[in-house]
A protein has these predicted regions:
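Acidic/histidine-rich helix-loop elements
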Residues: 41-55, 97-111, 139-145, 236
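Alpha-helical cap/lid subdomain in secreted, periplasmic
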Residues: 93-99, 114-265
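Short hydrophobic segments within beta-strands
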Residues: 81-82, 171
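Conserved beta-strand elements of the Class I
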Residues: 79-81, 101
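Short, solvent-exposed loop/turn elements at domain surfaces
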Residues: 86-92, 109-112
Length: 265
């Protein structure tokens, strides 16, 4: 708890420092949150048709799901499920020979993930699902959400998985940075660092209370300020090759811990 409070203080101090050190209205810089809010509104408007016609984006993996056979005996199936960070992760390079399945979709929030959890996870009969989400909920990609609403969605994902005998690994929400590229400040202002920390604290406790595995990317990827370490991302949000190199062994250890634990009930 003491470490969490120190991180929270450091992260909030960085928000203030970013605001104070930013020149008055330089090109491409959000001013009083206007440009950040404007870009989010543009994202929502640009995806309005998709939201109306296929909110969960069920078509994305429909054919791949239909072609997926039963798990190979003796090889527990593992699915990585989440948003763009999962979507861009080249699992075959990070986990050679493991045949892990990627079911990430860029930009998604937990309400969307709930819609597609059955076809993209449950029906594929994995032994383990590794879920990485939350950052787009905090940003408000599909509309404003309270922490309580996000937490409720996480709990629903866990309930669905466990009811179908699937072991759950909940990943921490990733740290972010505001000075790692032209889009970094926009991403930073859309994603409250204190909400990221609060959600991670809740996730860790929820996993402990319900017998799930907590995958702590945050501690390994945050610097002394509580922000994403330089060199692990090109835009302050999405990991690059170096970032995924940090994440892969942590994910593998979490998967092995989940498989070694009791069967989901």
């Amino acid at each position: 708890m003491k470490k969490s409070l120190v991180l929270a203080g450091a992260m909030l101090a960085c928000v203030a420092a970013a605001a104070q050190s930013t020149p008055a209205n330089p090109p491409g810089t959000p001013q009083d949150g206007y440009e950040s809010a404007h870009s989010l509104e543009m994202y929502r408007e640009g995806n309005a048709t998709m939201f109306m016609n296929d909110f969960g984006q069920l078509r994305r993996y429909h054919d791949a799901d239909a072609a997926m056979g039963a798990p190979t005996p003796g090889e527990p199936r593992v699915i990585f499920f989440g948003d763009s960070i999962t979507d861009i992760w080249k699992l075959d390079e990070s986990f050679p020979g493991k045949h892990y399945i990627n079911r990430g979709i860029g930009g998604q929030t937990t309400p969307q993930m709930l819609v597609r959890f059955r076809p993209d996870v449950i029906d594929l009969k994995p032994a383990v699902v590794v879920i990485l989400a939350g950052t787009n909920d905090i940003a408000g990609n599909t509309g404003p959400e309270t922490l309580e609403q996000i937490e409720s969605d996480y709990a629903s994902l866990a309930d669905l998985a466990r009811a179908n005998g699937i072991r759950v690994v909940f990943s921490s929400v990733m740290p972010i940075n505001y000075d790692s590229g032209p889009n970094a400040l926009k991403f930073f202002l859309q994603r409250s660092p204190d909400k990221i920390l609060a959600l991670d604290v809740w996730l860790k406790k929820y996993c402990a209370d319900h017998g799930l595995v907590y995958l702590d990317y945050f501690s390994a990827m945050a610097d002394e300020r509580g922000l994403l370490k330089r060199g692990l991302s090109e835009d302050g949000l999405h990991p690059n090759a170096a970032g995924f190199a940090v994440m892969a062994p942590l994910a593998q250890a979490a998967i092995e811990k989940a498989l070694a634990g009791p069967a989901a009930q």
